[in-house]
């Protein structure tokens, strides 16, 4: 829902209100409030809201991912969730980050990513 709303040009406030109302998540905490007591948890109820909070608090794509990862716990998943929302909201992955990632990936991964992006994202 967050990625869809971000792609529709909704504000962070609108995204927050929709998620709170629709899914019942408490998004009124800050990353600083979450960080001291947060630990790995396999439940989406303990990683998705925190990832969304990192997005809401983030100031750009990279800052959002850094905030999500800084929470600890299931950091790779949370970075992916927050980063996905940030990519949609901020209009893409910054060129410097994208270039660094692409040079580290096998060509077949890049082909699959480009096909997916062309088919589902650029529409």
Where on the chain are the PLM-derived regions?
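Amphipathic alpha-helical interface segments
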Residues: 1-58, 63-71, 84-88
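Catalytic phosphate/nucleotide-handling subdomain of diverse soluble enzymes
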Residues: 50-123
């Amino acid at each position: 829902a967050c990625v869809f709303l971000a792609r529709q040009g909704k504000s962070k406030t609108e995204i927050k209100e929709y998620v709170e109302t629709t899914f019942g998540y408490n998004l009124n905490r800050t990353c600083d409030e979450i960080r001291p007591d947060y630990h790995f948890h396999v439940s989406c109820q303990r990683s998705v809201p925190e990832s969304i909070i990192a997005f809401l608090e983030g100031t750009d794509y990279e800052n959002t991912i850094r905030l999500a990862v800084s929470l600890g716990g299931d950091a790779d998943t949370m970075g992916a969730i927050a980063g996905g929302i940030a990519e949609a909201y901020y209009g893409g992955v910054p060129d410097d980050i994208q270039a660094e990632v692409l040079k580290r990936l096998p060509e077949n991964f890049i082909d699959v990513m480009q096909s997916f992006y062309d088919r589902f994202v650029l529409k």
